[in-house]
Amino acid sequence: MLKVFLVEDEFVIREGIKNNIDWKAHGYEFCGEAGDGELAYPMIQRLRPDIVITDIRMPFMDGL
């Protein structure tokens, strides 16, 4: 299973993406989430996801 990590500063959008996709049915494991790039960076280094879904414009550190 590929591990997916989500980075999105808008809580409603983040929850919508996280909760409305049947990750396991599509062969993915949802391994974590963060509200901005600064919080996400150490988590991504620790969790080593295969895929990162990220917003581009976020406070502190953008998705690029």
Indicate residue ranges for each PLM-predicted region.
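Non-catalytic signal-transmission and effector/linker regions of two-component phosphorelay proteins
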Residues: M1-K3
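Two-component/phosphorelay signaling modules centered on CheY-like receiver
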Residues: E10-C31
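Conserved catalytic motifs of ABC-family nucleotide-binding domains
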Residues: R48
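Active-site residues of response regulator receiver
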Residues: D55
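Receiver (REC) domain active-site loop signature in two-component systems and cognate sites
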Residues: M58
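Acidic catalytic/metal-coordinating carboxylates
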Residues: D36-L39, D62
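Conserved sequence signature across two-component system core domains
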Residues: V7-E8, A34-G35, V52
